A protein has these predicted regions:
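Short active-site oxyanion
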Residues: 30-32, 70, 102-106
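Alpha-helix capping/helix-boundary segments
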Residues: 39, 78, 97, 112-113
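A general alpha-helix detector
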Residues: 8-9, 42-46, 61-64, 81
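Conserved glycosyltransferase catalytic-site signature
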Residues: 6, 76, 92-98
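Acidic catalytic patch
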Residues: 37, 61-87
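Acidic, PIN/NYN-like endoribonuclease modules and their adjacent C-terminal/linker elements
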Residues: 100-131
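Short, well-structured N-terminal submotif of metal-dependent ribonuclease cores
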Residues: 1-35, 50-60, 68, 123-131
Length: 131
């Protein structure tokens, strides 16, 4: 098994450097690929901000990763929940943080995060702290 850094995963999608894409494809064909939650988080940010890839395309890309036979995603159930919420309009980072909490109650000062989660019908409990 080999672990991918963000730049390898980005190359796999955007295919903007032929030599690097060839290496990434060879790695994918040769071994099981481990993707950490942090790599997924950074990949979403890079693809959204630098490459301006639309949310629907990002959702499809990450959903396909979950279904790929030779890919092992850290905490795949939490990532799957986060992707469901992301598809409903939640921020990917917020959704992933919340999904990773499991049964723990997420506490935050971020009212917008709390409101967006509730509006999207996201089930885990989320509390805004007042100061």
């Amino acid at each position: 098994m080999i672990a991918f850094d963000t730049n390898l995963l980005v190359r796999a999608l955007v295919a903007d450097h032929d030599d690097q894409v060839a290496v990434v494809r060879q790695l994918i064909a040769s071994d099981t690929i481990f993707l950490s939650r942090t790599v997924l988080l950074e990949t979403e940010w890079v693809l959204r901000t630098r490459y301006r890839i639309p949310r629907t395309d990002l959702s499809a890309f990450f959903a396909a990763l979950l279904e790929t036979d030779n890919t092992l995603i850290e905490d795949a159930d939490a990532v799957s929940h986060a992707l469901d919420w992301y598809a409903q309009g939640a921020d990917f980072a917020d959704a992933l943080h919340l999904a990773a909490c499991g049964s723990a109650v997420m506490h935050t000062f971020d009212r917008d995060f709390c409101k967006a989660a509730r509006d999207a019908g996201i089930a885990p409990e989320l509390r805004v702290l007042e100061v």
